Structure formats: structure tokens, C-alpha cells
Amino acid sequence: MGALTLDEWGIIALSLRVALVSVVCSLPLAILVAYVLARFSFPGKMLFDAIIHLPLVLPPVVVGFALLVLFGKQGPIGKVLDQWFGIVFAFRWTGAALASAVMGFPLMVRAIRLSIAAIDQRLETAARTLGGSRAWVFASITLPLSLPGVITGTLLSFARGLGEFGATITFVSNIPGETQTLPLAIYTFTQVPSGDAAALRLSVIAVVLSLVALATSEWLTRRVDPTGRQ
């Protein structure tokens, strides 16, 4: 199979950076959305929940096209970000991170939401009765008790980001050194006669990274589970 080339190491580094940035940027919003869905009832909640989980059921190409329309240089959001803040997503690695974040966001929200919903609300009520503000109760009780779900959701989203293909190639294309992540590079190598060995090497790396992420999620969840379950 041979050793990895410098270009292949660069592809791996770019993929890790894209996946890491996507989860770091989406985690605070995912925690907020999960908390709202788990603890509040409001008109339109079912619709809001459906919209959050829409990337799970939509073809990734549709998600990528929607991102291109919204965040492209001439899109309503992308144009403002470019002119006012100099932020460009289309055909940049930051766009790949955005696509990964959008595709992994439902997984993160779902894991955190289930973890929050499993917490006995009497604990939160007792803390509020003793004078704790909602923010204090969330930070000192709800968030620590939901940490296993946060870890699971984060690592699942990270693994999803490593494997993202359809939305990424539609939104930011397949530019070597800029947006060519692991799945896109594997696809590229399979299209050339001499690329089978490189495709195999990168496929093995992708499998290993995904297994490490899942194993780490399981191990950390057991370590921080406040119930002490093994």
C-alpha cells in the first residue's frame, strides 16, 4: 500500500481542521437548541425541531446547494459577510467547515437533547427554589449532568464532518489544498488509473479516524457519566 505522501498528509490535516472547526463553532448553539427543545414548549416547536433535523433526511447535495445560494459571494448572507467583515465561505476551507457543521448539527443536538431530557427536573426545580437563577442552574446542574450527551454529540458530529462529501463538493468544490478533504480526495483518486493505492491509503485513514472518534466517545462517556454506570 505504501507510505503516505506529503500531499496526503496535507489532506488529512485539512480534514481534521475542517471537522474540528465545525464542531467547536457549532457546539454552543447546539447546546442552546438542545436545551430549548428539551425544556420548553412553544408554538411551532415541532416545525423548529423538524428544521433542525432536516439535514439528516435531505440529500447532502441539496444542503450544499442551499449553502451556496445563501453563503455564496452573491448570496444574501454571503454578500453581507464579505462586504462588512471580509468573511468568505464559498470555495474556501471555511465553507467546508460550514458544510460539515450543518450536516453534523442534528446529530449533536439530538445527543445533547436526549441527555438533558433524561435529567430529573426536580433537581433543577429544587435549585431554583433555593434562589438559583436559570442560568446558574443550567451551568451548575444541567450542563454537568448532560456532559455524556455533549461528548457523544460532539464526537459523532466530528466523525460526520470527516466523512462529509455531497454538501462539501457542491458548496466549495474540490480544490486541492483548499477544500479537498478526505472523502473528496478519495473520490478524485478513484477517477484516475494510478490512484487506487492512494485511495486505499486514505480510505484506511478515514476508517481509523472514525473508529478512534467513536471509541473515544464511548470511553469518555463512561468516564464522566455522573451515575457511575459502566
Predicted regions and their residues:
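Interhelical loop and adjacent transmembrane-helix boundary motif
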Residues: 1-7, 171-211
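Periplasmic/extracellular loop-to-transmembrane helix junction in inner-membrane transport proteins
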Residues: 1-24, 36-45, 82-86, 188-197
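Membrane-interfacial helix termini and adjacent extracytoplasmic/periplasmic loops
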Residues: 3, 64-101, 171-175
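Hydrophobic positions within alpha-helical transmembrane segments of bacterial inner-membrane proteins
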Residues: 19, 23-31, 35, 61, ...
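Transmembrane-helix boundary motif in ABC transporter permease subunits
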Residues: 21-52, 65-67, 115-117, 122-123, ...
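Transmembrane alpha-helices
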Residues: 24, 109-112, 116, 120, ...
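C-terminal transmembrane helix and the adjacent membrane-cytosol boundary/short C-terminal tail
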Residues: 44, 106, 110-124, 128-129, ...
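Non-cytoplasmic
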Residues: 72-76, 150-188
